[in-house]
Amino acid sequence: MSVSVCPCGTGNLLDACCGHYHAGTPAPDAQSLMRSRYSAYVLGLVDYLVGTTLPAQQPGLDRAGMAAWSAQSTWLGLEVESAEVFGGQPEHAFVTFTARWHDTDGDHQHRERSAFVQHAGRWYFIDPTVPLNAGRNDPCPCASGQKFKKCCASYLGS
């Protein structure tokens, strides 16, 4: 059992916070998933980062790059500004946050409004660096069973 403080910034112990998501318990909402992903970067849990990215995007992820960035950075903190559902659809959400880290080039911060989708009881991060190859009439990449235009197209600005 770990007694370390969770890196996500809540002040809770890792095992009582993001640690149980890393162990397989689904995150209950988009903000919890985002916090657990930040903690996964701090802890070098690349498999977790891949597994919590939209399944349609997972083959396009740069696992080696993720691992290198995680290992070569000293993570300085996370601030969550907001978490909101999109258009009243509880399975679509945005989380706005700022992450700070230090590497050989100095101190950095990154502010992002990340998109998340829930499918089959699990939340997934939609990675803006990996293309979603879906036409408007194609099945939605989130696996909802709906056409892209009726599901995530408006949410993702497509």
From Swiss-Prot:
Membership in a protein family: Belongs to the UPF0225 family.
Q: What Gene3D superfamilies does this protein map onto?
A: 3.10.450.50
* NCBIfam families the UniProt entry points to: PRK00183.1 (NF001213), PRK01617.1 (NF002449), PRK01752.1 (NF002486)
Signal peptide positions on this chain: none
Pfam families named in the record: SEC-C (PF02810), YchJ_M-like (PF17775)
What InterPro entries does the record tag this protein with?
A: NTF2-like_dom_sf (IPR032710), SEC_C_motif (IPR004027), UPF0225 (IPR023006), YchJ-like_M (IPR048469)
Identification of the protein by name: UPF0225 protein PSEEN1229
